[in-house]
């Protein structure tokens, strides 16, 4: 790229895909300079070689965007993240349809709007604790599904328990040992496996809870949020993501 072209670039819109990154570059007046596609492993090197220092690099706040934003900021560029729903109005659906190239152009266009609200770039620590929360939520969903499966099997044998998972968890070992009920042998074995899985999920959730509680003790912002009436450790972590 000629040096004069490099100097003209004021902003680029970047669409991040799994294998290829699409770029749409404009000058200070918003005029298109070029559009191109790069392999992911070429992107940062290309930016350092072809973009002027401080150039705005706008991306949707999607999976992996915070990582790229941190990398770009460290290289001296102005990384901006935009919530996907704020980019949608700028997509030119009638001109070639929705694809990665038009998405990059839409992101570039959205970034220049004076009232645009940008997503704060998260630190690795923030993303780590949010990842922990996501894993815990996954365990929680798995546990709910496991409990429902156990209830479903028991119901087929005429065994019904109160809605409280604690009641079911306390009663299930005795139910499995009770030879007088109608449970078949294979059903008992299957439910024993499900019970062990349930307990394992409880242990994993408790581990996550300990990690979250430790984070709240160590993080002043989370500690302040947790002092608000009605906000516990997990909610205080969620508050900080915004």
Which residues does each PLM region occupy?
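A detector of single, family-specific signature residues
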Residues: 1-242
